[in-house]
Curated annotation (Swiss-Prot):
It comes from the Bacteria. Its main location: cytoplasm. L-aspartate binds at E176, R222, H450, R491. Homodimer. Belongs to the class-II aminoacyl-tRNA synthetase family. Type 1 subfamily. Keywords: Aminoacyl-tRNA synthetase, ATP-binding, Cytoplasm, Ligase, Nucleotide-binding, Protein biosynthesis. PANTHER family: ASPARTATE--TRNA LIGASE, MITOCHONDRIAL, ASPARTYL/LYSYL-TRNA SYNTHETASE. This is Aspartate--tRNA ligase.
Length: 591
């Protein structure tokens, strides 16, 4: 096979007159009465190849037999296209290759869908024939971007003196929040490894080992319910460092992300990124990962409406809840009564018992609850919400967490529905000052808001076991366009604090030792103050590429039900394999 001289997509006017050898796939073939035109595609793009009997009758005859997705080698000369033949849609549109030779390297069956951008095909079929889906230019470009992003992270961390150190995939199952993927041990029947949800404990042990600055681009595994921005296996940019403050770790993170955006998108991001406390984010946006590209902020109107004779509002306030509102500016005419009823159904998915609303018309409140507002209260409400004619006011009244969840989700929906979001903007945000614990209603106890190795604020350590609700964490999340793209913290590095943390989470000293004894012992050997962050590579690429599903950024992803249509994983294994592992499967009962 002759060596390629150029990629198809690289050819331009500087190559005119040059002889080239190209390898690629036939994107399209057109027979125009004696001339055959082939669009030849490789990973760098498409170029038009012309087969003319005046140049090579033999090449024309072979070209007549090729079909879409045949793999070919073409030798020819680059020519300028005529002015009327220039194709501005192609990067190579000012040139074409006049073919002298063509060799068919392999044929192709007719693909199950056209290999081109914008093709209307189901996700299931795309994933079943993922190797064909990935040939499409838009998919190819996503993985070019992913490579650029990964390379930029590596280069930056290397320049900052971080060591790339691998941690094991076969490790111990420890309670970190989501379910573990378990791997049975053949050598020790009845015992299991776990695939890591993160390298959290191991990277902390690398700080105990004195490596000072560690990073890893690492695959992680979580057996959890899936959604558009989650996959059972995903990739993190994972880093840990000793003797630095959280502000210094955040500065390193900002430097990396600024470089990544510049390399991947040629956009300059200003530093430092804006900051917001967890409390402020929940109060203003109803979310711990707010999209700050648009307004529609939540406003607390409990004081304004507490004396209004509307039982829904009164009951919520009397029971320790609150009433908050969103002012959708100039949106009153966008929503019919039917549309507003649909919004009520939407917020019910987040626990809200309903959605009250008002419209402002000619300076007056209009809507089902307008009758409960006397003139003075109506004026006070409009002033509090800066409401004007044409505005739509939307209210939720309940416990604070339900109000936040329902109005936060509604805010995001309205931002899209009202076209308030600049899709070209990249809005980074730090969310800081997190509570160390959050209350789990189902479990009836406090659990870690992040993970059980997060350092409490020093002044709150005495309250770990006595008043968990007031303990704050040295934790920080990085948010981009409403997605959490990373989370980090300073870590507990003293044994007595870690023991107290485990007790606060309901571990007995014995169970803590059984699960984490190796970590507890390491903390007795001079573990330094340390901290770090983990950034979601797949999610960062998803946002930068303008996609809305992680599947598009992972070469061979799973479906929403954790199935791989390409390989049909997960699948059954043989009885012999199970016997070797001393395992039996439980058969489902059939009615």
């Amino acid at each position: 096979m002759e060596k390629r001289t150029s990629y198809c997509g690289e050819l331009n006017e500087t190559h005119i007159g040059q002889s080239v050898i190209l390898h690629g796939w036939v994107q399209k073939r057109r027979d125009l009465g004696g001339l055959i035109f082939i669009d030849l595609r490789d990973r760098e793009g498409i170029v038009q190849v012309v087969f003319n009997p005046e140049f090579s009758k033999e090449a024309l005859e072979i070209a007549d037999s090729v079909r879409n997705e045949f793999v070919v080698t073409i030798k020819g000369k680059v020519h300028a296209r005529g002015e009327k033949a220039i194709n501005d849609k192609l990067a190579t549109g000012k040139v074409e290759v006049l073919a002298e030779e063509i060799t068919i390297l392999n044929t192709s069956k007719t693909p199950p869908f056209y290999i081109e951008d914008g093709v209307n095909v189901s996700d299931e079929l795309r994933l079943k024939y993922r190797y064909l889906d990935l040939r499409r230019p838009e998919m190819n470009n996503i993985f070019k971007m992913r490579h650029t992003v990964t390379r930029t992270f590596r280069n930056k961390l290397d320049a900052l003196g971080f060591f790339d150190i691998e941690t094991p995939y076969l490790t111990k199952s420890t309670p970190e929040g989501a379910r573990d993927y378990l791997v049975p041990s053949r050598v020790y029947p009845g015992n299991f490894y776990a695939l890591p949800q993160s390298p959290q404990i191991l990277k902390q042990l690398l700080m105990t080992a004195g490596f000072d600055k560690y990073y890893q681009i690492v695959r992680c595994f979580r057996d959890e319910d899936l959604r558009g921005d989650r996959q059972p296996e995903f990739t993190q940019i994972d880093l840990e460092t000793s003797f630095l403050t959280k502000e210094e770790i955040q500065a390193i993170t900002e430097d990396m992300l600024v470089d990544v955006v510049k390399e991947a998108k040629n956009i300059t991001i200003e530093k430092p990124f804006p900051r917001m406390t967890y409390k402020e984010a929940m109060d203003r946006f109803g979310s711990d990962k707010p999209d700050i590209r648009f307004g529609l902020e939540l406003q607390n109107v409990s004081e304004v409406v507490k004396d209004v004779d509307f039982k829904v509002f009164q009951s919520a306030i009397e029971n320790g809840g609150e009433v908050k509102a969103i002012n959708a500016k100039a949106a009153a005419t966008n929503f019919s009564r039917k549309d507003l009823d649909a919004l009520g159904v939407f917020v019910a998915n987040y626990g809200a018992k309903g959605l009250a609303w008002l419209k402002i018309e000619a300076g007056e409140l209009k809507g089902p609850i307008a009758k409960f507002f006397p003139e003075d209260k109506a004026a006070e409400l409009q002033a509090a919400l800066q409401a004007e004619d044409g505005d739509l006011l939307l209210f939720a009244a309940d416990k604070a967490d339900i109000v936040a969840a329902s109005l936060g989700a509604l805010r995001n929906k309205l931002g899209k529905d009202l076209d308030l979001i600049n899709e070209d903007e990249l809005a980074f945000l730090w969310v800081t000052d997190w509570p160390l614990f959050e209350y789990d209603e189902e479990a009836g106890r406090y659990v870690s808001a992040h993970h059980p190795f997060t350092l409490p604020k020093e002044e709150d350590i005495p309250f770990l076991e006595t008043d968990s609700s007031k303990v704050m964490a040295e934790a920080y999340d990085i948010v981009l366009n409403g997605y959490e793209i990373g989370g980090g913290s300073l870590r507990i590095y003293k044994k007595e604090v870690q023991e107290s943390m485990f007790r606060a989470l309901g571990f007995t000293d014995e169970s803590a030792k059984e699960q984490f004894g190796f970590l507890m012992e390491a903390l007795e050997y001079g573990t330094p103050p340390h901290g770090g962050i983990a950034l979601g590579l797949d999610r960062i690429v998803m946002i930068l590429a303008g996609r809305n599903n992680l599947r598009d950024t992972i070469a061979f992803p799973k479906t929403g039900s954790a199935v791989d249509p390409l390989t049909n994983a997960p699948g059954e294994v043989s009885a012999a394999q199970l016997a070797e592992l001393k395992l039996e499967t439980v058969k489902k009962e059939t009615n």
